[in-house]
Amino acid sequence: MAKKSMIVKANRAPKFSTQGYNRCKRCGRPRAYMRKFGICRICFRELASQGLIPGVTKSSW
């Protein structure tokens, strides 16, 4: 889980537009962010395995 201070800092408008970055809406993780879902890969995997993300299924071949 990300520090609350870092989550608050990320919500503020950056001084320059290129300094902005995405964070996971669920845990606040800044890395491995999946733009389509708005969450990080770890949260995505947890929610997908529980079946909470519509249209996402575990692949098997």
Swiss-Prot record:
Family annotation (InterPro entries): Ribosomal_uS14, Ribosomal_uS14_bact, Ribosomal_uS14_CS, Ribosomal_uS14_sf
Molecular function terms from GO: rRNA binding; structural constituent of ribosome; zinc ion binding
Domain of life, per lineage: Bacteria
Cofactor: Zn(2+)
GO biological process: translation
Keywords tagged on the record: Metal-binding, Ribonucleoprotein, Ribosomal protein, RNA-binding, rRNA-binding, Zinc
Note accompanying the cofactor annotation: Binds 1 zinc ion per subunit.
Keyword Metal-binding on entry: yes
Record bears the keyword Flavoprotein: no
One GO CC term on file: cytoplasm
Residues the entry annotates as binding Zn(2+): C24, C27, C40, C43
Any single Pfam family the record assigns to this protein: Ribosomal_S14
Family of this protein: Belongs to the universal ribosomal protein uS14 family. Zinc-binding uS14 subfamily.
HAMAP family (UniProt xref): Ribosomal_uS14_2_B (MF_01364_B)
Function description: Binds 16S rRNA, required for the assembly of 30S particles and may also be responsible for determining the conformation of the 16S rRNA at the A site.
PANTHER family: 30S RIBOSOMAL PROTEIN S14, SMALL RIBOSOMAL SUBUNIT PROTEIN US14M
UniProt subunit comment: Part of the 30S ribosomal subunit. Contacts proteins S3 and S10.
Protein name (record): Small ribosomal subunit protein uS14
Species in which this protein is naturally found: Herpetosiphon aurantiacus (strain ATCC 23779 / DSM 785 / 114-95)
